[in-house]
């Protein structure tokens, strides 16, 4: 009887536990209830992997391995069954006296480590755990980034590898300062071996766990390779003397620590019995090794990732880590999460079409119950200005329909592509934010104050000391700094030790007074740290160093940026206070400096600001937006030119396209341009192969009105279809649009498969079109060029003809450009005849901001700066000739 009751109770317990995770789909519940041994969760884009991580941790802590178990700590009773059945039926919590019967092999919250790639993701994970488990248990789970986890380990054990526990973390600027000193010591010419190239190679070595000794011992391919190894050794020696790690060292040195010290390794394997790693597809060799060293003998490791979103190969990530996980950890259970909760079917189908062309992947197909949604909008622009104008038009329409600026993201392959968009938006007065621009903590005044704070935390930090010893100016010149550096090296002490005893060194006799004054400032800062709160200490640094007085004097002299720099320092103090509020009694100077060193671009992205966001696709990883514009979908741009020569690189580019597509929730806009200027050179590009890989049924294509107008003269070939039984259909592509360069135009090209308008070159590999054409041009004048195109696929054939213009020199091209007007994108200089003119009181309508009234007008370089009070967004300033403005009457 007791056995029967226990079996009944176990069945009810399974039902009760399942109800606690009732919002999860079947595959997610499988992942949550798989508690022991290695687990690989292949989580597709938008599948809710954070939800799985949070719920899996919650299950480990609350129920352990109880689900699916046939065991109980004691025989079940009728009362147990009655109470549990009632809880299930009423949807209430089971009585506390049943807790012991509902648990089995539960895990203490402090025995769980969850590693993510961004502070933002770690923060979201912890916040959701607090809500699910309660504040105390949620806080005890260690959720952190790789680098933050390593900092925590090193703060405790750094002395085991010869570093102080108060070590400093160097950023890129600090590393370059160290390298300049190394180059001087080794007499290396930066022109022969650029510092950035040496730093990149050292970073690769650290990612691959190659020590300076191993680099020196390895046969070098050339002189530069051997020299870089010597630089690496000298660089690491200087960092150790300064008690500092660079960003790559945080993982590299932690791996060395764990590998070489079994007691440290055992401590963490026993402490963190369950390890969960997010974004595993983006781990490097060093991160893979770190994870394996932290994983205990029970192999309770769960990794979550998507091989189709592995896009950081250039940073050392290796997709093989996730592809080979099952081989490395025998007995792995693999679960695929393919249901997407973010996007519409058309968007997901487009993404699936693209990624299925990759071969190095586990394989999965995203699907959704969100509905079909709008088709993917593909726009072919004449050039990048036309592309920007089109995007502004679409955003304006969305705003009229009640949308918000922050709903829109413009994503691109490379940073250089943002300039035309930014320029157009600035002139049109469209609020926007570039993620990945200069960060707050990278501003000079902020870095200077942080350097002062750093030398108080770590007196051995000579690099930061050199930065600010004469900032503000104190009559401590470069020669004096070199003397101090040499003395410190001779005596094996820090530069601050020399400065504190400057009066004892004859070589410093001329600079004794400035140096001792600096020493007094340093001592006062130390006193401030010991006696005042951390934010008060930050304010003291700004005041006592003379930095505030320097900027106030600059402001009085009329320096334009002085007021902004003062405001930035005020914000710095606010940031320190916010850090103190978040960490309470655990707030320390070292902790604050760690936080700012580990902040990424995405961590500083403010989602609440109502502005269009511009960022690279790499930066957009993990984000989502209702409306996404994926620009520059052209051969040589996306995919990049260099990727064409490597199948591995091309597959990474395709994964990047997949990531970009899957950022969109409601609508996706993809654009390609016939002509694009990048890095000062204008080139004509074919549409990207990734566009051609999307099936026509999922997209809707339009093109620039200028291109439409040209097509009337044969600029774009008409589609022609000849279907042959047993063979593929043949279509003509954008045949005949000529390429103009050096006074001639070349013919167009055909394609194996075009859309209904005949201008996307599809089936790039299967049926590549061959174009033939000619153009005639005399230098100094523009002439017409006639091109014809031919394409075939299988047994089908397609033909088309086109007309193109070739402009033989820059003068003619510029003249012609004035004759072409783009909707919403005027030429750089508008002729007086067509210039817009506004007066205070004029009623206007803006494509983005809606209706408003002109309140002020100011002439500016043949244009007008117009100040407008808009009904919806208030006062905005914009350039008259660039803004998408239309005069209206009161009746309108």
Region annotations inferred by a language model:
Residues 35, 117, 137-141, 158-249, ...:
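ATP-hydrolysis module of ASCE/P-loop NTPase motor domains
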Residues 23, 80, 88-97, 146-150, ...:
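Conserved helicase/translocase P-loop NTPase motor core
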Residues 47-53, 68, 73, 77, ...:
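Helicase P-loop NTPase motor core
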Residues 47, 281-360, 364-369, 486-489, ...:
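Conserved helicase motor core of SF1/SF2 NTP-dependent helicases
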Residues 633-874, 882-892:
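C-terminal accessory regions
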Residues 217-221, 404, 418-430, 443, ...:
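Conserved helicase C-terminal RecA-like lobe
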Residues 1-164, 169, 266, 320, ...:
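P-loop NTPase Walker
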Residues 33, 37, 104-109, 256-275, ...:
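Short basic/glycine-enriched coil/helix segment immediately N-terminal to the Walker B
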């Amino acid at each position: 009887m007791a056995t029967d009751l226990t079996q009944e109770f176990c069945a009810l317990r399974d039902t009760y536990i399942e109800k606690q995770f009732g919002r999860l789909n079947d595959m997610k519940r499988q992942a949550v209830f798989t508690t022991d041994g290695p687990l690989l969760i292949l989580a597709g884009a938008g599948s809710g992997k954070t939800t799985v991580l949070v719920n899996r941790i919650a299950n480990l802590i609350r129920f352990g391995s109880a689900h699916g178990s046939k065991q109980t700590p004691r025989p079940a009773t009728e009362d147990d069954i009655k109470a549990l059945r009632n809880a299930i039926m009423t949807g209430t919590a089971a009585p506390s006296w049943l807790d012991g019967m509902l648990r089995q092999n539960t895990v203490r919250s402090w025995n769980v480590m969850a590693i993510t790639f961004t502070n933002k993701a770690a923060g979201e994970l912890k916040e959701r755990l607090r809500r699910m488990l309660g504040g105390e248990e949620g806080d005890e789970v260690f959720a952190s980034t790789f680098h933050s986890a390593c900092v925590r380990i090193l703060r405790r054990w750094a002395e085991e590898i010869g570093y102080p526990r108060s070590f400093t973390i160097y950023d890129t600027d600090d590393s370059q300062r160290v390298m300049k000193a190394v180059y001087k010591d080794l007499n290396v010419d930066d022109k022969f071996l650029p510092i950035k190239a040496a730093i990149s190679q050292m970073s690769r070595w650290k990612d691959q766990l190659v020590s300076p000794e191993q680099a020196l011992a390895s046969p070098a391919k050339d002189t530069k390779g051997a020299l870089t190894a010597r630089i690496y050794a000298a660089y690491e020696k200087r960092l150790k003397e300064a008690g500092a790690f660079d960003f790559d060292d945080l993982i590299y040195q932690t791996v060395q620590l764990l590998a070489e010290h079994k007691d440290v390794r055992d401590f963490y394997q026993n402490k963190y019995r369950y390890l969960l790693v997010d974004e595993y597809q983006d781990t490097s060799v060093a991160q893979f090794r770190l994870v394996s060293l932290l994983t205990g003998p029970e192999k309770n490791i769960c990794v979550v990732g998507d091989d189709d979103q592995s896009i950081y190969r250039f940073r050392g990530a290796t997709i093989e880590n996730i592809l080979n996980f099952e081989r490395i950890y025998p007995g792995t259970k693999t679960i695929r999460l393919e249901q997407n909760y973010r996007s519409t079917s058309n968007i997901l189908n487009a993404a699936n079409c693209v990624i299925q062309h990759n071969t190095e992947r586990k394989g999965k197909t995203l699907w959704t119950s969100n509905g079909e949604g709008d088709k993917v909008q593909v726009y072919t622009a004449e050039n990048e200005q036309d592309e920007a104008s089109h995007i502004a038009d679409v955003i304006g329409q969305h705003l009229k329909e009640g949308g918000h600026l922050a709903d829109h993201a413009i994503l691109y392959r490379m940073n250089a592509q943002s300039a035309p968009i930014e320029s157009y938006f600035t002139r049109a007065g469209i609020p926007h934010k570039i993620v990945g621009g200069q960060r707050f903590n990278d501003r000079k005044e902020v870095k200077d104050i942080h350097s002062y704070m750093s030398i108080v935390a770590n007196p051995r930090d000579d690099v930061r000391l050199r930065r600010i010893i004469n900032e503000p100016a104190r009559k401590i010149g470069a020669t004096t700094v070199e003397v101090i550096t040499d003395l410190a090296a001779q005596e094996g002490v820090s530069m601050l030790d020399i400065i504190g005893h400057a009066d004892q060194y004859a070589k410093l006799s001329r600079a004794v007074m400035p140096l001792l004054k600096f020493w007094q400032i340093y001592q006062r800062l130390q006193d401030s740290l010991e006696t005042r709160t951390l934010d008060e200490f930050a304010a003291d640094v700004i005041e006592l160093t003379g930095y505030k007085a320097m900027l106030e004097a600059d402001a009085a002299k009329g320096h334009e940026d002085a007021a902004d720099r003062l405001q930035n320092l005020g914000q710095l103090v606010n940031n320190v206070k916010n850090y103190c509020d978040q960490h309470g009694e655990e707030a320390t100077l070292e902790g604050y400096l760690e936080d700012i060193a580990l902040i990424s671009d995405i961590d500083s992205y403010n989602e609440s600001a109502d502005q269009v966001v511009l960022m690279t696709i790499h930066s957009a990883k993990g984000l989502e937006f209702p409306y996404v514009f994926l620009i520059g979908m052209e051969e040589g741009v996306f995919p990049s030119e260099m990727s064409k020569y490597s199948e591995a690189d091309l597959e990474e580019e395709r994964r990047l396209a997949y990531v970009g597509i899957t950022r969109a929730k409601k609508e996706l806009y993809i654009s390609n341009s016939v002509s694009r200027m990048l890095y000062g050179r204008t080139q004509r590009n074919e549409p990207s192969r990734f566009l051609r890989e999307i099936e026509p049924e999922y997209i809707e294509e339009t093109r620039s009105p200028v291109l439409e107008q040209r097509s009337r003269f044969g600029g774009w070939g008409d589609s022609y279809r000849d279907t042959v039984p047993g063979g593929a259909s043949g279509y003509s592509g954008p045949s005949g649009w000529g390429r103009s360069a050096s006074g001639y135009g070349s013919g167009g090209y055909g394609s194996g498969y075009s859309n209904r308008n005949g201008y996307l070159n599809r089936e790039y590999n299967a049926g590549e079109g061959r174009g033939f054409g000619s153009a005639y041009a005399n230098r100094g004048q523009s002439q017409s060029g006639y091109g014809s195109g031919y394409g075939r696929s299988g047994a089908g054939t397609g033909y088309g003809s086109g007309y193109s213009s070739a402009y033989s020199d820059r003068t003619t091209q510029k003249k012609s450009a004035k004759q072409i007007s783009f909707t919403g994108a005027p030429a750089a200089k508008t002729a007086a005849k067509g210039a817009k003119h506004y007066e205070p009181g004029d009623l206007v309508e803006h494509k983005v901001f809606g209706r408003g009234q002109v309140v002020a007008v100011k002439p500016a370089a043949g244009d007008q700066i117009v100040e407008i009070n808009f009904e919806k967004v208030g006062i905005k300033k914009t350039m008259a000739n660039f803004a998408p403005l239309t005069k209206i009457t009161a009746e309108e």
